[in-house]
Amino acid sequence: MKKQQRFIYLHLLGICFLGMQANAQQVGFTTENDAYLLKLEDDYYTNGIFLHLSYADQSKKNTKRVHRFELGQQIFTPLKRNTRTPADIDRPYAGYTYIQYTRSWFNNEKAVVQLTGTLGIIGPASGGEGLQNTYHRWLKYAPFLGWRYQISNQLVLNTGVLYAHNLIATKKFKWMGWGAAQLGTAFINASVGTKMVYGLFNINQSSQLWNAAVEKKGMPKKEFFIYWNPKITAQGYNATISGGSKTAADSAVTLH
């Protein structure tokens, strides 16, 4: 678990954003992998790829709204790749592919509200095993040996909500508190956290911090900042760990 914690810490503390030219629409691609930290082995969350499209509009009350569509895939594996038996698996094998819609409201410079809806699949149908084997072959990495024990196919229907509010805001520093929750067939959880931002940043409704650097008119100022986003999560259910309703009847390995 120490390796997993180190990855999360570096991910949260080390991210920065550069200013981008803004338009009414924005297309982006994000990739996450422990190999970017020059490591030769995978941790529990081994890979993520995300393609997203965002656009902005204004409501009748002149509130900015940002609509975001995301197509993503995440891959989870045990810590050790030479796990050949269920007894060796300390984290279930799981692939997760989904499409997600997020609507964000910015009704003033202090508050952010987000609602999300997600449709996806966990299990062999997600294509996680094939993708990992492909890029491991390209990069000359050893394959993981226990994919036959991966989580069974499960349909994902999830919804989520997030609310954030500025606590302190100066020209170069911002401190925000936030709370979020997910409910559905694959993930049930609640989180509280804080975002501490330092650098050159725009107000929330024009900041890449909230994927809001899209404008129907005009263009926001450039941004360059770092942020820290610690959080506490109460986990009710995670299908990439506990599996779906059919898992108990097949050869998949789950943790409860």
Which residue stretches match the model-derived regions?
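Transmembrane beta-strands of outer-membrane beta-barrel pores
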Residues: T31-L37, Q73-L79, W105, I121-G127, ...
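Outer membrane beta-barrel transmembrane domains
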Residues: L37, L79-N82, N202-S206, W210-H256
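N-terminal ordered "arm"
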Residues: Q25-K61
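Residues that define the transmembrane beta-barrel architecture of outer-membrane proteins
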Residues: D43-I49, R65, Y93-T97, V113, ...
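Bacterial Sec-dependent N-terminal signal peptides
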Residues: M1-Q26
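Long, hydrophobic/aromatic-enriched structural stretches that serve as scaffold segments
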Residues: T63-Q132
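Short loop/turn motifs that connect adjacent beta-strands in outer-membrane beta-barrel proteins
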Residues: N23-Q25, D57-V66, N107-Q114, L167-W175, ...
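Residues on the lipid-exposed face of transmembrane beta-strands in outer-membrane beta-barrel proteins
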Residues: I49-Y55, L71, I99-R103, L119-I121, ...
